[in-house]
Design a protein with these regions (language model features):
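Short hydrophobic alpha-helices and adjacent helix-cap/hinge residues
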Residues: 1-191
């Protein structure tokens, strides 16, 4: 859904950059899902891999000038050096969309992801089933049911987007998610 959001708020986007540590299996899995989502939406995904947080600045710079937006997943290595990505995106006027709502205030345009506390609450019944003896293989996989969309209005204004038109595009995005049976809570930062 993050890439649907990118299409909604950066409609001219053709190429999206992403940074991740290929040694983190969760990041590789997420990146594979990102590739599929981009294909479905007609976006080209340009990847920059990193081995440590020290690599993040140069990796982000390698994407500048080649992408219309940058997406950062919950990759531990990249998120630990998010300030470097923010510096590059700010210097190059590239919208930054992230998957971790707790970090949007660092300088991303928007974040779409789950609330870790609520996700823990959703997981509790599963843990109880396991503690009562049910095999994990007998329990269906669940994804976060509710998402939070955090918008950084300071960045909206900095990149010259009309706050009201931005709100309209975000509202239509949230409505689409809700029509699909999901829920999106929109949280505005910087007003």
């Amino acid at each position: 859904r993050q890439f649907q959001l990118i299409k909604e708020i950066v409609p001219q986007a053709k190429r999206v950059g992403t940074l991740y540590n290929a040694a983190e299996i969760n990041s590789v899995t997420t990146n594979n899902l990102a590739k599929e989502a981009c294909e479905e939406l007609g976006l080209e995904l340009l990847e920059a891999t990193v081995s440590s947080s020290a690599d993040v600045f140069l990796a982000a710079q390698s994407l500048a000038g080649r992408v219309d937006a940058i997406y950062v997943s919950t990759d531990n290595t990249t998120v630990s050096a998010l300030d470097a990505v923010v510096q590059v995106t700010n210097e190059n006027d590239i919208p930054l969309i992230i998957a971790d709502p707790t970090t949007v205030e660092k300088g991303a345009l928007a974040a779409l992801g789950f609330n870790y506390y609520q996700h823990g609450r959703q997981t509790t019944p599963i843990v109880i089933k396991i503690l009562k003896g049910k095999k994990p293989t007998e329990i269906p996989v669940e994804f976060a049911k509710n998402l939070e969309l955090h918008i950084n209005m300071d960045i909206v204004r900095e990149i010259g987007i009309s706050p009201s038109s931005f709100r309209d595009s975000v509202s239509s995005f949230a409505k689409k998610i809700e029509e699909e049976g999901g829920q999106v809570e929109t949280i505005v930062v910087g007003e």
